Design a protein with these regions (language model features):
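Glycine-rich oxoanion-binding loops at beta->alpha junctions
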Residues: 52-106, 115, 154-156, 168
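C-terminal non-catalytic interaction/assembly regions of soluble proteins
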Residues: 256-410
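Glycine-rich beta-alpha junction loops
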Residues: 43-47, 141-145, 187-192, 216-222, ...
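Short glycine/serine/threonine-rich phosphate/pyrophosphate-binding segments
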Residues: 15-25, 49-50, 93-94, 114-122, ...
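N-terminal phosphate-binding or glycine-rich loops at protein starts, especially the Walker A/P-loop
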Residues: 2-54
Length: 410
């Protein structure tokens, strides 16, 4: 059989281990020289590919340099938020497949979240419609953990570990003074509260901070919130409150919208960051106590020093599994994670495949049964689910300047 080439791209927001998934795809591709001649990367995703921006991994990261991807945050290939047209009759599709043919592409991999799986779906369906032999596989990633038909997603474990660690650190700082205070920590999550729920992992004992955790899966009532804080002050001096950026009231109005400064992004979506600051001002004005807000922002997804070893290993495994599946003829699929336990009841994960058409444009939220009846905490079921995903540490090499050493695209 004549050799063909493999191409891989990254899309959407980066994670601490999206480059580990990339490493898995590339390293596995390079172990099949009798079948795969070149392993190419799309610079800035499908959008960059349309503008002929590609690289050859054997030239860009030769030898041991490739392994540097596994401790490098961000997206080595760069990203994009380009959405392919809904109609497969659009001229962009024959243009893409003409480029694939010119590069002798036999396997296409896209690492990303929901919109990226939408791209995988469209490309695989178009390939089938024209009888193209190109295999199209999706590699999951998202710190939001909101992809359906998979136990969890690469990136969530490391982000959850960062959130829990940071919340624990903020708690120790807040406990310094014996003066009533409320610290509100705003965490990423528009519709799904998985990452905010992970703040519960910071607790060392029952009754420890964070005392309140608010997710977008449950409506937020400002008056009840203030009453809950007042009651908590009867036993506690310093209160830590963790909120998802997407919390909303019973009418569906985002809490951040009560701040008149909230704007919209280039897609017309409301810019949700700001609910923490709004609640800070609300607490200060209504309760008359010291209040501050902390927005974790992009640090949740780019911390290399707190990468979960479990998350990293699973991301690499997903990349390798996807290549093996594509070489076996699979297409139009996303690599999924299936949770298992060994004979001693310990956590294990195996990779599987799911029809990407059943995944794109769907969203997995935190089960309501994992949220306490009062709406401001998570149950032990969530703790058992999340704790295995943050286990283990990795060693990030340091440069001569004493700072983490990453690999960069030239």
């Amino acid at each position: 059989m004549a050799k063909k080439n493999l191409i891989v791209g990254q899309s959407g927001g980066p994670t601490a281990v999206i480059n580990s998934s990339l490493y898995g795809v590339v390293s596995e591709g390079l172990t099949h020289p009798d079948t795969i001649e070149h392993v190419y990367g799309m610079v800035n995703g499908i959008e960059g590919f349309l503008n002929d921006r590609i690289l050859d991994f054997e030239e860009a990261l030769p030898g041991d340099k490739l392994k540097g991807l596994t401790h490098t945050p961000g997206a080595y290939l760069g990203s994009c938020r380009y959405k392919l047209p809904e109609s497969l009759e659009d001229p962009v599709y024959p243009a893409l497949f003409k480029k694939f043919e010119e590069l002798n592409i036999g396997w296409f991999f896209y690492i990303g979240g929901n919109d990226s799986m939408d791209t995988v779906s469209k490309l695989s369906r178009y390939a089938a419609s024209i009888g193209s032999p190109i295999r199209v596989i999706g590699e999951p990633k998202t710190i939001d953990n909101d992809l359906v038909h998979t136990d969890h997603t690469p990136g969530f474990g490391s982000a959850a570990k960062y959130v829990a660690s940071t919340v624990r650190e903020i708690t120790t700082d807040a406990n310094v003074y014996e003066k009533r205070s409320v610290t509100i920590i705003e965490i990423m999550g528009r519709h799904a509260g998985w990452l905010t729920a992970a703040s519960a992992l910071a607790r060392k004992y029952d009754g420890d901070n964070p005392l309140f955790i608010y997710l977008p899966e449950v409506a937020f009532d400002q008056d009840v919130f203030l009453k809950d804080l007042e009651k908590a002050f009867e036993k506690n001096c310093n209160l830590i409150v963790c909120v998802s950026e997407g919390i909303h009231d019973a009418d569906g109005t985002f809490i951040c919208e009560y701040d008149s400064s909230v704007g919209t992004d280039t897609f017309g979506h409301k810019m949700l960051a700001g609910c923490g600051k709004y609640l800070e001002n609300l607490v200060r004005s209504r309760l008359g106590v010291k209040a501050r807000s902390v927005e974790l922002n992009v640090s949740q997804r780019c911390s290399s020093t707190l990468i979960s070893a479990t998350d990293q290993q699973e991301a690499i495994a997903a990349g390798r599994f996807g290549v093996q599946a594509a070489l076996d003829g699979e297409t139009g699929k996303m690599v999924s994670f299936i949770r298992q336990t060994d004979s001693e009841g310990n956590y294990q994960m195996v990779c599987g495949l799911e029809d990407v058409n059943a995944i794109c444009n769907e969203e997995k939220t935190v089960p309501l049964t994992w949220i306490t009846s009062d709406g401001h905490d998570v149950t032990e079921d969530f703790i058992r689910y999340a704790r295995p995903l943050i286990q283990g540490n990795i060693e990030v090499p340091l440069g001569e300047d004493g700072l983490p050493k990453f690999v960069y695209r030239k």
